Every structure is written in structure tokens, then in C-alpha cells.
Amino acid sequence: GIRISEARNLQDTDVHLDENYLVIKGAKNMTDRIVPISQSLSNVCRQYVYYRERLPLKIDKKYFFLSLSGRKCGANHTIFRWFRLILKDAGIPFTGNHHGPRIHDLRHTFSLYAMEKMTREGSDMYHSMPVLATYLGHKTTQSTEHYVRLCRVMFPELERKVEFINQQIYPELEYG
């Protein structure tokens, strides 16, 4: 759920793999925040560090993510190029022209599933929104609402109820 620029600017001292969290400093809204990460992501990051330390280069130990030259991970276009290669390897078509998929879509997907999980665990949506906003580094919940759109995945029971009501109101339409 972090921004590309936040990942690029992570320093080794910001990454706490034993405790499963990142410290995001001076983000888009000039705020710092702590972002928990999963054990599986910590494990992947440990593997990354293992191989990074074996690069036959003089590396800049300050930044966590490095380019193949050993310096801070480069410009966004380099990251986008790698993302497109990953999409291709996964068999996911890249349509380009801002139609995606985009790296930023991962942030939207994370937001949607985080909200769905909180709702499934019994949290009220309106109480969950500020939690998610803080996690994403948003100043307001309005920014977060842009990321979280109500969808069928989040509320299957509501969908069933609405479908039943629609069948009563518009019986001539086919449903299901």
C-alpha cells in the first residue's frame, strides 16, 4: 500500500524486517508513518537483501532498494519498465496510455482488500476509513474514498438483497 516514491526512498534504517514494519519518512503529505508488513513480505525482503549484498559492486548502503549499478533505485520509468516485464511474464496484457494495469493500481487493490478485510472482521466501514487513510498516508478520508469503491467483492450479502429487491421492482429483467 505504499507509494512508488516511498519505496524508492526507503533507507536501510527504515526497514525493520524482524518486527515486520517500515518507517515511511517525509511522504507526499510531509508526514512520517509506520507501515506494518506481512511475514511473507519480510521474508521476500530478506531474500532481496541476501542477493543485494552479493552484488559485485560498491553499493550505497543508505537506500534499501538499489539499481543494478549499486545506487539508489532509479527514476520511475525504470520501475515501470520492470513492472511491464513482470506483467508480460505473468501473461497480463499491458494496454498502455494510462489504461493499465499501472503500478499505482496495486495501491488501489490493496486499499480495497484491506477495507474488505476490516468489514468482514466486523469493523464498521466509517470507523475503518480513517484507519486505512492513516495507513495510506492520506490527510483526509476523502482521499481514501477515491481508492475504495464499493464493489460486489466487499458486500455479497448486500448484493443478494439488492438483487431480490430489483427483481420485485423490475421483474421483466433477467438477473444472475
Where are these regions (language model features)?
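C-terminal secondary-structure termini that scaffold catalytic or DNA-interacting sites
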Residues: 162-176
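A short, glycine-centered helix-capping/turn motif at helix boundaries
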Residues: 1-9, 117-118, 126, 138
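Short, structured motif recognition centered on aromatic/hydrophobic residues
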Residues: 7, 40-49, 65, 80-84, ...
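Conserved tyrosine-mediated DNA breakage-rejoining catalytic core shared by Y-recombinases
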Residues: 3-5, 9-43
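Short amphipathic alpha-helical linker/capping segments at the junctions of internal repeats
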Residues: 63-68, 152-155, 165-169
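C-terminal catalytic core of Y-nucleophile DNA break-rejoin enzymes
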Residues: 29-46, 62-84, 98, 102
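Short, basic (Lys/Arg/His-rich) helix/loop patches that form interaction surfaces
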Residues: 81-134
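Catalytic-site neighborhood detector that most strongly recognizes the C-terminal catalytic loop/helix
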Residues: 26, 136-161
